[in-house]
Amino acid sequence: MKGYHLRLFWILLLLGITIPRAAYAQGSMAAAQPHLDKAKAAAWRPADGLNDLTHLYEVVCAPALSPKGPGEPPDQAPPPLSERKVPPRADWYQEPAKVFDNLYWLGSWGTASRIPPNPGGDSTWAVTTSEGIILIDSGYDYSAPVLIGEGLKKLGLDPAQIKYVVLSHAHGDRYFGSRYIQDAYHAHIIMSEKDWDVLAKSDEPNEIKPKKDMIATDGMKLTLGDTTLTLYLTPGHTPGTISTLVPLKDGNQRHVGAVWGGINPSLVRYRVKYFANWEETFKSWSASTVRFQEIAAKAGADTYLTIHPFYDNALEKIHLLQYRKSGDPHPFVSKDNLNRFLTIIKECTDAQLARITAQPQSTKLNQ
């Protein structure tokens, strides 16, 4: 009998642990489901591949859909430059492209285009003005001389005319190339104060960190010649993520582009903790999304431009521009797509928040 009671004790103990966890998982998924449904509805356009945002939904909502719930891989220090494996040019190179009369794409594509490798590549946007060029992000140190320096020349532009680089946030895929641009072309580097602080604390290689320069503030107007960009602080991906409104020209038509400065919310990267906990992270990112959506609507924004080309189907749209005839709609222009994009970001974030704040359901075993 003693052995039986011992076995029963361990069975009840195990049940006492596992059943509340199962109840928590079920309860938290139930709390998240309305947000997941809204995100999926915003993404799903099966009959229109160009405007279908299912891939965005699958990536951004993945943590909320996971049985383990929200979280991210253990933080790891980046390798020193001497140990880093730079992918061959053929694995990331893409031809530069003109997207609007005053906007150019200078990005990468491919599984090995990022360090660590990540499918889809990175976007750098070049805004031309009457007095020079403004870049939004810079890609990697190994790719910037090719994609930006050589790319602008291929488009008939002079990289020496780069006057400013707006860095959306302090992650390597945004800023590693900026030190090259700062040194080669004497361009000003702009980032939020909080992300300059992140950069200073980060374990990423100091050799490719830009020298601290201009500080972006919320609502800041960046004017160069005949063009003014407006920068907004939208924390959540990093403490000081920047999202940008860009005036666009398409013949006689005028549009407003919205560059959302991140994708997934982040808590820590390269030994730098961004927020106190996940709840604060999710609340910050969700609030930023709502605010920027309102700002974009008030500004008449009708074009969404992302920092990774697979989230806005940039290459497919660029391909269509080759066949566009006078009077045809511009494939990048769509207020609906902009709103759907931001809705997916918000609802996937809210789904993660719902999962971590849901209360465990009571069971007889843990009463």
State where each predicted segment sits:
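Active-site environment of divalent metal-dependent phosphoester hydrolases
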Residues: 143, 170-176, 196-199, 239-242, ...
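Active-site HxH/HxHxD metal-binding segment of metal-dependent hydrolases
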Residues: 37-41, 142-146, 150-221, 319-328, ...
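N-terminal secretory signal peptides that target proteins for export/translocation
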Residues: 1-6
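Accessory terminal helices/loops
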Residues: 26-86, 90, 251-254, 265-367
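Conserved beta-strand hairpin/beta-sheet module of binuclear metal-dependent hydrolase folds
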Residues: 89-155, 243-266, 270
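Metallo-beta-lactamase
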Residues: 83, 92-93, 98-101, 146, ...
